[in-house]
């Protein structure tokens, strides 16, 4: 089954994700790069049956909209393959065959689509992204859409939504984006010229958003005119994984806070690895900076990564394209923010 693509529409648009019994939604008006948020929210199904949950959503006024759906990273795989030497109309079938050893379900159980890597020129011309979603995931989404009489125009993925958001401020330059919400994974993307070149899921320690990431006392001891390379934090780090004695201090943690700091360094290491790989691979596209989003802790995350990676790290801002952001609660923003990127999509494909 081919992922649908958006057609022109007007009026209010609903963007949703439906994963882990949580419906996240944003209702907006507008077009292009100028939107106004009408309302938003996060609704948990809990112990309700689908019928009862749908009734609750109807009572919230979420029935009958033109709707875009975004799949969360846990609902699909984004694979990168060598572009098969076939005609454009045969790309999907050829890509389906190539990924058979990269997925753990039967190919007949997958919905796939193919996307070019970057601008499709030079080094990027030999690569393709393949989106692979289990048919059961798509059916689950469309079942809810049917009950609520949504006119689903597109099913998008978070990688592409994140690309759209990070391209708002500096669309032509290469930028890295990291968006963190509650959960055990975060998504890191690198885009340039409004095109996605690199995407990677990074594991997070359990409870990451509530952990202590850095210690003020340690920061005060650091030289003010330099940053400490990541390698000094992780003397036992190896490419094959983390050892059981992973620690930033080289000694047994003295407190729960220090234990949190040690575990948080794993994210720092993986961010640095991704940046290093980018700089080695795409020498013609120097990284202009990193943009992060982590709800109320966005500024803290930006300062931490800026100090310890030496990159220009700032908070991801979307205000230029979206009015009414105060309609999204602080608590809901980490989950709702990626949905805004779906509103910015401008790909148009022929049926």
PLM feature segments, named:
Residues 1-351:
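Hydrophobic/aromatic-enriched cytosolic interaction surfaces used to assemble or bind macromolecules
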